[in-house]
């Protein structure tokens, strides 16, 4: 009875739910057990309102928290539940062969650009299905997914963010620019940057963020800057692509050389003269990979 608002030694058992799907399961199990037991059950059942980690009781919790238990928000439990659902859905769509192949394809070995990245073995189409099913996910959940060690979780987060962008561009772009740490492989960049930052810049005149990212020491942020211009190119705006290509003429990283070459090719599809002029002026300084 020294545990603040908790019931102390007067413990009781209970089974609780946090949504209607859980409630149906609880009611079913409760009824089955009661029928088997043959007598009314003393177990409580109802919606879960709050909870705390029970193991804290054995870790001098009251010494550290003299006012008693600090109950955790139920939103924490909901977040964990949906995160778990996404993980299960991704794993259900995984392929053992791809789980072996993808780490090699994305260069996850020591000293390589994707060092330490882990793969469940899920294809992009399968990941899109999971993202679509959770397109109403909170930013808290997207953040948690972006912090995952699993590549497909981070991709799923970015695909959900693209859906969020369609409803609230300002909020989605702000989130994207402050969570780029999780956008750390070329496919994660290429499948998100044009459709979030790139699309946003098409509708706004200030493109200075591209040049800020281009000066970043983080190669993935540099690639975000270049690949974001894909949407500008598709809308007839070539200036930023050309200027960024000039900035990266001396880049040593093959992923940046490829990104610049890709965007220049896209410009050439729409304005061959502009591309030829750029090549005639800069081809001597351009890396072979870019050419």
What residues fall within each predicted segment?
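Flexible coil/turn and secondary-structure edge motifs
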Residues: 1-87, 133
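Alpha-helical scaffold domains
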Residues: 84-291
């Amino acid at each position: 009875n020294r545990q603040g608002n908790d019931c102390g030694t007067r413990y009781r058992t209970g089974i609780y739910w946090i949504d209607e799907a859980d409630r149906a399961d609880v009611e079913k199990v409760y009824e089955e057990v009661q029928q088997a037991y043959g007598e009314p059950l003393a177990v409580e059942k109802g919606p879960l309102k709050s909870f705390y980690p029970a193991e804290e009781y054995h870790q001098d919790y009251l010494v550290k928290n003299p006012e008693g238990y600090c109950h955790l928000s139920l939103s924490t439990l909901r977040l964990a539940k949906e995160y778990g659902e996404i993980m299960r859905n991704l794993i259900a769509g995984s392929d053992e062969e791809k789980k072996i192949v993808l780490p090699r394809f994305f260069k996850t070995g020591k000293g390589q650009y994707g060092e330490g990245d882990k793969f469940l073995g899920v294809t992009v189409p399968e990941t899109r299905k999971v993202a679509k099913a959770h397109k109403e996910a909170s930013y808290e959940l997207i953040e948690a997914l972006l912090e995952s060690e699993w590549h497909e979780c981070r991709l799923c987060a970015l695909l959900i963010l693209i859906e969020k962008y369609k409803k609230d561009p300002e909020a989605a772009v702000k989130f994207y620019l402050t969570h780029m740490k999780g956008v750390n492989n070329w496919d994660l960049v290429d499948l998100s940057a044009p459709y979030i930052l790139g699309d946003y810049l098409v509708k706004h005149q200030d493109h200075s963020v591209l040049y800020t990212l281009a000066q970043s020491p983080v190669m993935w942020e540099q690639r975000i800057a270049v690949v974001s211009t894909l949407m500008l190119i598709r809308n007839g705006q070539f200036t930023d692509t050309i200027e960024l290509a000039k900035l990266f003429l001396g880049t040593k990283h093959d992923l940046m050389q490829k990104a610049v070459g890709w965007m220049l090719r896209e410009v050439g599809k729409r304005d061959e003269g502009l591309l030829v002029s750029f090549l005639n002026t800069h081809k001597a300084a351009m890396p072979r990979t870019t050419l």
